[in-house]
Structures are given as C-alpha cells and as structure tokens.
C-alpha cells in the first residue's frame, strides 16, 4: 500500500523536475527517494520525465525556450494537488500540459518568435484559450493529446510507446456519433521514444482511439482498441 508520506514525496516531483527546489531540499528529496519503495521511486521518475519532456515539446513547437513565467505556471498548477493526496504520477502530465497551454496563451510565444510566418497547428492549439489535455496509457507508454475546439485541431505526444510490429501500423481514429474516421497512421520507423503528431478536423468527435492495423492501415478499425482518450 502507498503511504501518505509516499504521496507527499510524489507531490515534489514537479518542482524537482523544474529545478524549483533549493539544494538542501533537493538532497532531502533524493534521500527520501533512495529509501522509497521501488514503485514509488519509478512513479517519481516517470513524473519528472513527463514534465521535462512536455517542456521540451513546447520549446520545439514554438522555437523558443519557455519563459520563466511558464515555469511558475507549471508550479502553480501542481500546487492545488498537494491537498488532494491522489496518485499524481497518473495525472501529472495533465496539469503540466494544461499549465503550458495557459502559459502559451498568455505569452503568445508562437506569434512573438515567428513574426514572419503563420503559426503552426501546434502553436495555434497550445495558445488557444479553450485548450484541454487528456492522457492515457498506450502500449506500455503514454499518449497525451492537447486539443482545442476553437482551432478544430489537436497535438498528440507519445512517450515511450514501442513501435508497432513490422508489417503493421498504429492507426488513430476520431470517433463521433457516426463512427470512427481515420486520423492517420504511424509505422515502425515513425514511432520514436518521443513521437509528436498533429490532429486536424476534430469535428464532432468525442474520442481518439488507437488500434494496430495491417499494412498501411485500414478504412475501418479491424484490430483491438489499444487506448481511448476522451475529447470532451
């Protein structure tokens, strides 16, 4: 069983990932981490990795380093969770990505850093005032979608998802009341430890589903649904 002190340790993963602790606090966290149960230590490491990878995604999407204010937004998003004592290693990326989206909306990084070009789909989504974030497990890794109904688009980030077997592809499906519509495929060479893709024309879809399909994909899902992320 995970003890309350373990939850308290996990709550420190986000500020630790953002180097928002003093040297003394960092040493104390690392001491507690070395004595923590293996599952707790693994969850701590996963949250640290997720926060840092999400920050890297934003830097790549906007061609700029996230500003100091964005770091503060991340810390502020993590703060309320401390009173809830829930297993934040499963929800950390929600708060992190949502805070990033809020930060980008406030600071307009895409526009400021690319004045001579139209914002990319990723920049538009991340800067949208209605941006939402969902995340779930996919093939042993994590799939996170940041999406905007105003922009009718989304950004998919897959971390540590193993590539599909040779001769198959991951296929994404936008599902609405009429059924699934293909949102693209990813073959073995397209899937890396951190894979990014854009989703366009969300329409009235309420779910993003993932299946494994043969060859270069299918017109309708034929494989087992690996994951479903609600787009609500």
Swiss-Prot record:
It is found in: Cell membrane. Residues 113-232 are extracellular. It is a single-pass membrane protein. One of its GO terms (molecular function) is sigma factor antagonist activity. GO terms for cellular component: plasma membrane. It comes from the Bacteria. The chain crosses the membrane at residues 92-112. Its main location: membrane. GO terms for biological process: regulation of translation. InterPro entries: Anti-sigma-K/W_factor (IPR051474), Anti_sigma_zinc_sf (IPR041916), RskA_C (IPR018764), RskA_N (IPR053877). An anti-sigma factor for extracytoplasmic function (ECF) sigma factor SigK. ECF sigma factors are held in an inactive form by an anti-sigma factor until released by regulated intramembrane proteolysis (RIP). RIP occurs when an extracytoplasmic signal triggers a concerted proteolytic cascade to transmit information and elicit cellular responses. Belongs to the anti-sigma-K factor family. The cytosolic domain interacts with sigma factor SigK. This is Anti-sigma-K factor RskA.
């Amino acid at each position: 069983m995970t003890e309350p002190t373990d939850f308290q340790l996990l709550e420190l993963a986000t500020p630790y990932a953002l180097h928002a602790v003093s040297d003394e606090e960092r040493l104390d966290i690392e001491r507690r981490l070395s004595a923590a149960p293996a599952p707790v230590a693994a969850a701590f490491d996963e949250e640290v990795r997720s926060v840092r990878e999400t920050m890297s995604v934003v830097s790549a999407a906007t061609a700029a380093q996230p500003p100091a204010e964005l770091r503060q937004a991340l810390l502020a998003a993590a703060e309320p969770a401390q009173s809830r004592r829930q297993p934040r290693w499963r929800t950390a990326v929600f708060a992190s990505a949502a805070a990033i989206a809020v930060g980008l909306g406030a600071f307009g990084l895409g526009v400021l850093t690319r004045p001579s070009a139209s914002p990319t789909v990723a920049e538009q989504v991340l800067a949208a005032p209605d941006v939402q974030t969902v995340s779930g497990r996919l093939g042993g890794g994590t799939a996170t979608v940041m999406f905007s109904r105003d922009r009718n688009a989304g950004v998919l980030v897959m971390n540590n998802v193993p590539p599909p077997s040779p001769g198959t592809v991951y296929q994404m499906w936008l599902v609405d009341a009429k059924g699934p519509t293909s949102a693209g495929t990813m073959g073995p060479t397209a899937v890396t430890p951190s894979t990014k893709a854009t989703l366009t024309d969300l329409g009235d879809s309420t779910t993003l589903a993932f299946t494994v399909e043969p060859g270069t994909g299918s017109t309708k899902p034929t494989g087992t649904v690996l994951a479903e992320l609600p787009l609500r």
